[in-house]
Design a protein with these regions (language model features):
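Active-site mouth loops of central-metabolism enzymes
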Residues: 9-22, 43-45, 71-84, 150-158
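Alpha-helix-loop-beta-strand connector modules within alpha/beta enzyme cores
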Residues: 3, 52-73, 117-128, 173
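Divalent metal-coordination and catalytic microenvironments
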Residues: 10, 31, 35, 70, ...
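Histidine/acidic residue-rich metal-binding segments in metalloenzymes
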Residues: 85-177
Length: 177
C-alpha cells in the first residue's frame, strides 16, 4: 500500500520536563518509523505549554530533529489548572495550531466559553477532554456488565455526554466551530 504520510493528532512528546519518558527527537523518530510525517503534540509538558517560550522551544527541538513536522497544541488554561485562560493569541503567534487542556476537562463553563471565543478570534480549534470528573470518579472501564463482572470501577457514559452537550451548546453560543 502506498499512501501519503499520516498525521498523528494526539502525541505526548513530554519535552520539556519529562525527557526520561520521551523527547521531541525520540517521539518524532518513532512517528516516522510508523509512517507518520507530522504530529500534533499535547501541552502536558513541565512546564505546561501555556507560554509562547515553551512553544518556541518545542519547535526548535523539532527543527533540530528534522524528521517530522511538529504541530504544538497549547494549553487552554495556565498550568492546565482550569482556572485562568492561557494567552491563546501569544500561543498562536508562537506556532500553536490548537489549544487543549489534554487529559484535564475544563470544568468551568465560563472558562470554556471564553476559550472558545478567544480561540475562534485566531482561527484555532479547542480540543476538548469531555469528562465530568464528579461522575467519572476513579472509574477505569465503561460502566456495564463486563466492568462489573471483572470487578472494575465503571465510568458512566453520562460523564462524557454531559460535557459534550455543554460544549456543543457553548460552541453554538459563541459561533466557534
Amino acid at each position: 500500500v502506498v499512501c501519503p504520510g499520516f498525521i498523528d493528532m494526539h502525541v505526548h512528546l513530554r519535552e520539556p520536563g519529562h525527557e526520561h519518558k520521551e523527547t521531541v527527537a525520540t517521539g518524532v523518530a518513532a512517528a516516522v518509523a510508523g509512517g507518520f510525517t507530522a504530529v500534533a503534540c499535547m501541552p502536558n509538558t513541565s512546564p505546561v505549554n501555556d507560554d509562547a517560550a515553551i512553544t518556541r522551544l518545542i519547535l526548535l527541538r523539532a527543527h533540530q530533529a528534522g524528521l517530522a513536522r511538529v504541530y504544538p497544541v497549547g494549553a487552554v488554561s495556565k498550568g492546565q489548572a482550569g482556572e485562568q485562560l492561557a494567552e491563546i493569541g501569544e500561543l498562536r503567534a508562537a506556532g500553536c495550531v490548537a489549544v487543549s487542556d489534554d487529559g484535564h476537562p475544563v470544568a468551568s463553563a465560563s472558562l470554556m466559553r471564553r476559550a472558545l471565543e478567544y480561540a475562534s478570534m485566531f482561527d484555532m480549534p479547542v480540543i476538548d477532554h469531555c469528562e465530568d470528573i464528579s461522575l467519572a470518579g476513579d472509574g477505569v472501564a465503561h460502566e456495564g456488565h463486563h466492568a462489573a463482572a471483572l470487578g472494575l470501577r465503571g465510568l458512566p457514559a453520562a460523564a462524557e455526554e454531559i460535557n459534550v452537550e455543554r460544549d456543543v451548546t457553548l460552541s453554538g453560543l459563541t459561533g466557534a466551530p
